[in-house]
From Swiss-Prot:
Location of this chain's protein in the cell: Mitochondrion
Chief place where the protein resides: mitochondrion
Lipid biosynthesis among keywords: yes
Keyword Acetylation: no
Residues annotated to bind NADP(+): 13-14, 16, 36, 40, 44, 66-67, 77, 122, 125-126, 198, 202, 230-231
UniProt lineage: Eukaryota, Fungi, Dikarya, Ascomycota, Saccharomycotina
Similarity-based family: Belongs to the short-chain dehydrogenases/reductases (SDR) family.
Name used for this protein in its record: 3-oxoacyl-[acyl-carrier-protein] reductase
Matching SUPFAM superfamilies: NAD(P)-binding Rossmann-fold domains
GO terms under biological process: aerobic respiration; fatty acid biosynthetic process; fatty acid metabolic process
Gene field: OAR1
Note: Present with 1760 molecules/cell in log phase SD medium.
Length: 278
């Protein structure tokens, strides 16, 4: 039996998430892409040229889940999805769980299993806290914190079950890994007006991941946080209030600005490092 690792990447239809999917696929992983709408997942995170250049065993699909609707998205009977192929048009699918694609891809010779989760979906704040509505605050917290925590717990349960079910996974690839994409704004030293709720959501995610790492280390699951500064071409850059963007640029300087591909490289470095430590 060949065991083939799969990555789940949220917020993967554009920006940092898209770059991460491209990097992981390039490195030989299969990917389950999560986007917020059916329309967004139709814009696959990996272009057809790269898909065709992938290895024969690699698979890719996309699933639509609106994280703003936490916790109700947990109760859906099925999720709209699309599976992508090297040699034929995409096929619309219905998936009963996030791990359904792995079961559909597996056969008597190959077992696909989720070994990596990257929580990259994020929602920015566009005004001062006093001008941010209760509904907007709820959306920010649901997307940036509540849903990532839930995704993390769902995947950790799956990872622990996989380790018990297939003991031979040990040594096959990198250790099961969670990577949560936070922000430089999570730091108490960064006080940028117009980002208060967003910063709080990212601080919560960072602290959650720090403590979770200690909880999961005895269970052979690694948990990491990446806290980028300004990332070119992302929604955070485009949606930040002008004053907040200018202040952030002055505060972090040129060294704090990066490209999505750099974040993707850091994700791969963390994941592949766990293979060396196994």
């Amino acid at each position: 039996m060949h065991y083939l690792p799969v990555a789940i990447v949220t917020g993967a239809t554009r920006g940092i998430g898209k770059a991460i999917c491209q990097k992981l696929f390039q490195k030989g992983l299969s990917c389950i892409i999560l986007g917020s709408t059916k329309e967004s997942i139709e814009r696959t995170a990996i272009d057809r040229g790269q898909l065709q250049s992938g290895l024969s065993y690699q698979r890719q699909c996309a699933i639509a889940i609106d994280f703003k609707k936490w916790p109700h998205w947990l109760d859906y009977e099925s999720y709209d999805g699309i599976e992508y192929f090297k040699d034929r048009p995409p096929l619309k699918q219905k998936y009963s769980t996030l791990f359904d694609p792995c079961n559909k891809w597996s056969n008597n010779e190959r077992r696909y299993y989720v070994n990596l989760l990257i929580n990259c979906a994020g929602l920015t704040q566009e005004s001062l806290s006093v001008r941010t509505t209760a509904s907007q605050i709820q959306d920010i917290m649901n997307v940036n914190f509540m849903s990532p925590v839930t995704m993390t717990n769902i995947c950790i349960k799956y990872m622990m079950k996989s380790q018990r079910r297939w003991p031979e996974l040990s040594g096959q690839s990198a250790r099961p890994t969670i990577v949560n994409i936070s922000s430089i704004l999570h730091s108490g030293k960064m006080k940028v007006p117009g980002t208060s709720v967003y910063s709080a959501s990212k601080a919560a995610l960072s602290r959650f991941t720090e403590v979770l790492a200690a909880e999961m280390e005895p269970r052979n699951i690694r948990c990491f946080t990446i806290s980028p500064g300004l990332v070119k071409g992302t929604d955070m850059i485009q949606n930040l209030p002008v004053e907040a963007k200018e202040m952030l640029e002055r505060t972090i300087g040129a060294s704090g600005t990066s490209a999505p591909a750099e974040i993707a490289e850091e994700v791969w470095s963390l994941y592949s490092r766990t293979a060396l430590e196994t």
